[in-house]
Amino acid sequence: MNSPFHNIGIVTRPNTPDIQDTAHTLITFLKQHGFTVYLDEVGVRECCIYTQDTDGCHIVNKTELGQYCDLVAVLGGDGTFLSAAREITPRAVPIIGINQGHLGFLTQIPREYMTDKLLPVLEGKYLAEERILIEAALIREGKTAERALALNDAVLSRGGAGQMIEFEVFVNQEFVYTQRSDGLIVSTPTGSTAYSLAAGGPIMQAGLHAFTLVPICPQSMTNRPIAIPDTSEIEILVTQGGDARVHFDGQSFIDVQNLDRIIIRRYHNPLRILHPTDYQYFKTLRQKLHWGEQLV
């Protein structure tokens, strides 16, 4: 096959029904077409791959997938995709998602049509889309204590004590407000159909260069979601945090102390997602959110 890709990485979701069969089909397909296959070591260790399918494949960690591969296929749900994206985006390697999970906003190719949909993509016939990521830094006593990336959102939230937290928000060093609430969601357009949507935030078309600030159960009913350019720097100063945390894509977190500052910016590398040529963003929204179809 004359392909712009040569080394294909595969990330699999552990403890998923039929994941071994899906991986077997994909690995066999790629080998038959002459591609070099790299497997995420976690998937191999968690028995997502039949032992015989690892023959002739390279087994590496997710960071090394970004180093050695020129395309990564994610078999799983959106959670698996989010985890892979944070590891691979720094290497600017494109990702394609195959849905082995449930909702599938990001992993859109049904596994039943996996090889039929992938073949044109591997031949160079695809739609490429760039998605922005969040880069967050936790500043404690004037020093950077932690850093993290997020494709969906960074969420400041109250801890197990259950009490409201209080914090100040600044955009480009301009004071916005003091808020008492259960927390604040800073969402990318990709994350606008996730936690942000459940908290009353707007849906943002995936290609927009914007963030939204979405309060979680604010004490003041006048606190509403705000959309800002993704060139903005967001600063959150925690004044009464209790045992608050900052969560990243709902998969990792940092504990927060009083007077900590969380600085949020757009990450310098966008995530590049590849879609089949028949991909339509609003069709995906209709299917996943069960919107009405055209009447005429």
UniProtKB/Swiss-Prot annotation:
One Gene Ontology term of the molecular function aspect: metal ion binding
Key words, A-Z: ATP-binding, Cytoplasm, Kinase, NAD, NADP, Nucleotide-binding, Transferase
HAMAP family (alphabetical): NAD_kinase
Necessary cofactors: a divalent metal cation
Record's protein name: NAD kinase
GO BP terms, alphabetized: NAD metabolic process; NADP biosynthetic process
Catalytic residue list: D78 (proton acceptor)
Catalytic activity, EC: 2.7.1.23
General function of this protein: Involved in the regulation of the intracellular balance of NAD and NADP, and is a key enzyme in the biosynthesis of NADP. Catalyzes specifically the phosphorylation on 2'-hydroxyl of the adenosine moiety of NAD to yield NADP.
Protein family according to the UniProt entry: Belongs to the NAD kinase family.
Swiss-Prot/TrEMBL catalytic activity: NAD(+) + ATP = ADP + NADP(+) + H(+)
Pfam families: NAD_kinase (PF01513), NAD_kinase_C (PF20143)
Ligand binding (NAD(+)): D78, G79, N152, D153, R180, D182, Q251
Name of the gene this protein is made from: nadK
Native source species: Neisseria gonorrhoeae (strain ATCC 700825 / FA 1090)
GO-annotated cellular components: cytoplasm
